[in-house]
């Protein structure tokens, strides 16, 4: 029992830390004695410290739990897969917060609630990852979504940010309604919401008549809700506008964190049952459509953030290959792809934030970056080459393993489409590199030095992207264990 308490202590800690920071901000930001001080940087550092402590608590608690455990009225499950996804989520949150401080100064952004909302959404996604019941899963998704709606519109003086928040609210509410309808259909057909009970019903009993059709429709609606949340085609239409209009740190967070938690839920919900083949076909077609649209639509973009938005859609297609395979190797490749995508995207948006210091918005503004800031240009080039899947960078290892898993399960067409779209994607990634090194800018821009936080973040993520191929075995071994733990 004591070991189980230590295992769930990270969630307890970060929830308490979030509310303490909220009280701290409310009390001191309204203090007339202290002349109403701006607390966003102060709360930001404390929030980053809270995330890092939670990360250490997770790492310390992992060896204490040798088997899977259910806790809090069996609504949540703690196992190796949970640990992996939660650690990746906290790394992404820490990276997002660490790149925010210079943004606060440049934009004169002094709303400390920004950090509190990031922490609150992180809490909800930690619960999403460990959720083992449809009710717990849906409530965690809704808490996460409410935080994201406010974060997208947090830059109140920008009409683009306000528009992004409103669009996200309307479309997100629509997708949540679809998800809830699917959960209610499953409950109405089976009388169960717990994943263990659903697994027994779907695998151990004969389901006939109305119950069978009700379960199928419920799973279909849940799948649509999930695909909307991860911006898979054809449910992607909201992503480019919202990614572009939101503040850049929010865009970075939206590009990474929800995908980690939703893919964890996808594997939890759909790993069992007699409807796996149908779901694999749905993800098969969404994967192909996402890869094709992500590659072709990105070619026409002129803005950096919109290009990264379509690149994100394309990478969701690649990651969906892993689930489409329906094998242990497929799930392992999905986790590898998700891990490398998260760290590469943190790197890319940290560079975009560094460019924002001089209001770089369009791809054309990157002209001659190699002459004005060669280190930043080289780092951005490494990131783009990794996105394109050029060896020996980490992105190549990710795509190689995903395609290898597709070939292993006989999905030759899926692997072929992935290779072709990767080649097409090389065009717009290399176009960025060509713009930085060989083009003359419309106006010369003198880039300011980066702050220490982003420099350290870029150094760590760039080192991982560049040197991963030298020793990939630990990640391959860990992800294989995580994939196996889903079936235990």
Curated annotation (Swiss-Prot):
It is found in: Mitochondrion inner membrane. The chain crosses the membrane at residues 4-24, 45-65, 84-104, 111-131, 134-154, 168-188, 215-235, 252-272, 282-302, 308-328, 334-354, 375-395, 400-420, 456-476. GO terms for molecular function: NADH dehydrogenase (ubiquinone) activity. GO terms for cellular component: mitochondrial inner membrane; plastid. Its main location: mitochondrion. It is a multi-pass membrane protein. It is an enzyme of class 7 (translocase). One of its GO terms (biological process) is ATP synthesis coupled electron transport. Keywords: Electron transport, Membrane, Mitochondrion, Mitochondrion inner membrane, NAD, Respiratory chain, Translocase, Transmembrane, Transmembrane helix, Transport, Ubiquinone. Exons a and b and c, d and e are cis-spliced, while a trans-splicing reaction is required to link exons b and c. NCBIfam families: NDH_I_N (TIGR01770). Core subunit of the mitochondrial membrane respiratory chain NADH dehydrogenase (Complex I) that is believed to belong to the minimal assembly required for catalysis. Complex I functions in the transfer of electrons from NADH to the respiratory chain. The immediate electron acceptor for the enzyme is believed to be ubiquinone. Belongs to the complex I subunit 2 family. This is NADH-ubiquinone oxidoreductase chain 2. It comes from Oenothera berteroana.
């Amino acid at each position: 029992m004591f070991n189980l308490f230590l295992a769930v202590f990270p969630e307890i800690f970060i929830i308490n830390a979030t509310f303490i920071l909220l009280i701290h901000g409310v009390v001191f930001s309204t203090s007339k004695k202290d002349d109403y001080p701006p607390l966003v940087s102060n709360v930001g550092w404390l929030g980053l410290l809270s995330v890092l402590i939670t990360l250490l608590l997770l790492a310390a608690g992992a060896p204490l739990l040798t088997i899977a455990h259910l806790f809090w009225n069996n609504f949540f499950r703690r196992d190796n897969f949970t640990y992996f996804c939660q650690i990746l989520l906290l790394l992404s949150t820490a990276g997002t917060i660490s790149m925010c401080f210079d943004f606060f100064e440049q934009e004169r952004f002094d709303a400390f609630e920004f950090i509190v909302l990031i922490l609150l959404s992180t809490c909800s996604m930690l619960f999403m990852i460990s959720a083992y019941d449809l009710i717990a899963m849906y409530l965690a998704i809704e808490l996460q979504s409410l935080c994201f709606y406010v974060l997208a519109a947090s830059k109140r003086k920008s009409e683009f940010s306000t528009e992004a928040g409103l669009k996200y609210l309307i479309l997100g509410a629509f997708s949540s309604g679809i998800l809830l309808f699917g959960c209610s259909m499953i409950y109405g057909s089976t009388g169960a919401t717990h994943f263990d009970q659903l697994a027994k019903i779907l695998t151990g009993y004969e389901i006939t008549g109305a119950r069978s059709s009700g379960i199928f429709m419920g799973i279909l609606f849940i799948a649509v809700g999930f695909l909307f949340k991860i911006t898979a085609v054809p449910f992607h239409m909201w992503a480019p506008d919202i990614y572009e209009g939101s503040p850049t740190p929010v865009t970075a967070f939206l590009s990474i964190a929800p995908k980690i938690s939703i893919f964890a839920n996808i594997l939890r919900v759909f790993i069992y049952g007699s409807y796996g083949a149908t779901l694999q076909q749905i993800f098969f077609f969404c994967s192909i459509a996402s890869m094709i649209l992500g590659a072709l639509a990105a070619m026409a973009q002129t803005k950096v953030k919109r290009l990264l938005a379509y690149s994100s859609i394309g990478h969701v297609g690649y990651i969906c290959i892993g689930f489409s395979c329906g094998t242990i190797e497929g799930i392992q490749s999905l986790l590898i792809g998700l891990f490398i995508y998260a760290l590469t995207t943190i790197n890319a948006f940290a560079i975009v934030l560094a460019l924002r210091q001089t209001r770089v918005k369009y791809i054309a503004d990157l002209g001659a970056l190699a002459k004005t800031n060669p280190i930043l240009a080289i780092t951005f080039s490494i990131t783009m080459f990794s996105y394109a899947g050029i060896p020996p960078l980490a992105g190549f290892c990710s795509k190689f393993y995903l395609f290898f898993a597709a070939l292993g399960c006989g999905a030759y067409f899926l692997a072929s489409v992935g290779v072709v779209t990767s080649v097409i994607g090389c065009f717009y990634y290399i176009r960025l590199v060509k713009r930085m090194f060989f083009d003359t800018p419309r106006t010369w821009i003198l880039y300011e030095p980066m702050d220490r936080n982003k420099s350290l973040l870029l150094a760590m993520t760039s080192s991982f992207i560049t040197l991963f191929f030298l020793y990939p075995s630990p990640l391959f071994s860990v992800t294989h264990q995580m994939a196996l733990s889903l079936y235990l």
